[in-house]
Curated annotation (Swiss-Prot):
Role, per record: CALCB/CGRP2 is a peptide hormone that induces vasodilation mediated by the CALCRL-RAMP1 receptor complex. Dilates a variety of vessels including the coronary, cerebral and systemic vasculature. Its abundance in the CNS also points toward a neurotransmitter or neuromodulator role.
One matching Pfam family: Calc_CGRP_IAPP
Chief place where the protein resides: secreted
Name by which UniProt lists this protein: Calcitonin gene-related peptide 2
GO molecular-function term, one example from the UniProt record: hormone activity
């Protein structure tokens, strides 16, 4: 008796497999990557719609990537910041650098400031050898 309950299922599945096999022989399955899109057959409006869809997908992908990067940076407590020095020595060095890099009429007459390690006002280290 179990055979007669199973027989209709077996018959229907066999018919389905045969239909599927015959349809694959008639038109072979091609993946989306294998099929090439011929832009010559598309009209102007279809080309514009395709371009708009591609741009929208690209923008969404970039937005998701930016959101993901923002979430990653929010999660980390350590932020990479350049340390700045605001002491008089650092400011003097920056100003001297700016003046030396800036060109202009006064460049020929410009005398560089003495901002080295032996500049006026700096403590001189005593030699330990003496």
């Amino acid at each position: 008796m179990d055979f007669w309950k199973f027989f209709p299922f077996l018959a229907l599945s066999t018919i389905w497999v045969l239909c599927l096999a015959s349809s694959l022989q008639a038109a072979p399955f091609r993946s989306a990557l294998e099929s090439s899109l011929d832009l010559g057959t598309l009209g102007d409006q279809e080309k514009h719609l395709l371009l708009a869809a591609l741009m929208q997908d690209y923008e969404q992908m970039k937005a998701r990537k930016l959101e993901q990067e923002e979430q990653e940076t929010k999660g980390s407590r350590v932020t990479a910041q350049k340390r700045s020095c605001n002491t008089a020595t650092c400011v003097t060095h920056r100003l001297a650098d700016l003046l030396s890099r800036s060109g202009g009429v006064l460049k020929d007459n410009f005398v560089p400031t003495d901002v080295g390690s032996e500049a006026f006002g700096r403590r001189r280290r005593r030699d330990l050898q003496a």
